[in-house]
Amino acid sequence: MALLCAGCATSPHISPALDAQLAAGRPARITGADGALSAHRTQAILSKLGQGAAKTYLLKRHIAVEEAATRTPLVAGNKVTLLENGLATYAAMFKAIRGAKHNIDFNIYIFTNDETGQKFADLLIKKQTEGVQVNLMYDSVGCLDTPRTFFDRMKKAGINVVEFNPVNPAYAHGDWTINQRDHRKVLIVDGATVFVGGVNVSGVYASGPMKQLLHKLGRKSEKPSPREKKIKWRDTDVEIKGPAAAEFQKLFMRMWNSQHGKPLIGRYFPHLKPQGHDLVHAIGSSPNTPINLMYLTLISAIAHAQQYVYLTNAYFAPTPQTIEALEDAARRGVDVEVVLPSITDVPVVLYAGQSHYEDLLESGVRIFERKKALLHAKTAVIDGVWSTIGSTNLDWRSILYNYEINAVVLSTTFGDEMEQMFEQDRAHSVEITRAKWKQRPMGRRMEQWLSGMWESLL
């Protein structure tokens, strides 16, 4: 990592030489249920996956960079299920939690004391009383509005509860680093089933059909608020079954231990048999590393794209290198399309991102703003074979200050599903054209300019 520029704390940048050095002499390696695969077997898997010139180039060049940079394995033999909204995510989570036999590990940014949060808490307490050890880690800032008594009820039931980087320094577990937040959202059941993405535990996902689901699951549904009637949240998770679950378990353990959580002893790393054919890479990023690993691998994937780059992101306040990567891809003929929010819970970030629209549009990047929903997803699909879903936003906070977690999936079948989901979001969006953008009012231009001035501090 010596090639990373100095001053990354204020201006993250990946050296052009880093890509070549990381990839040099480092063929991609794949791990399976029983350990590392042979070079011959690895090459056979990648060759089959990379049929087509564009896919072959992306896999040959970028995957070696990704693996060398993250120093974690690409794991074969997984089944990855795309969960396109809060309804699908919660239903799958409830099913997995109900079926837990040994342990449940839950790392979450926001866990609200509302109807949805109470349902999760009730179910976790029920499993704890059945003898399943539940370990919950929540972020102190993300749960500022959640009373301590909400978590105390779970503690009294025997659940291990850890508050990440407490806002109150009296509760700190070491150095008080208030600006470093645990933005990860990951649920692991019995060390074998993983949920990862952008979905928090909150009633914002509970409008419409979600209210009916919660009612069926045993909690009387409250009447939707006027806000819930008007706005639904659009988010994405994935469910992963197979050997890659162990890599997410390791990431959870490291975070848990960093906060001095109670030692976790038990069946957390069972032998995991192959469940499918998807390759999965678990990537956890930290503000304590020279550069955000998910940021590095996304920039590299964009740089090696040959056909298309489709991004969907909730909080878009991009770094100069993110903009440069997108513009360079568009100029070399790659179809670069980005779906972003039109409405948001953090307007200053929305305006900061919009301050870059003009330059992106001039380079050929197509920008769409999602309507009739608050977009909270953080996903990408590139050349139909490389996809990522997780908690990482394309903003400075995710890159510099947050702990994040993503799943990278190599699969053409899953890539097709991701492309279809992107197309659905695009169909519910309005394209921002250069002509239309030049007509925006002066007041809005000032908001965007001022927000852009402060984007690295948001």
Provide a role label for each language-model segment:
Residues C8-L458:
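Charged, low-complexity intrinsically disordered terminal segments
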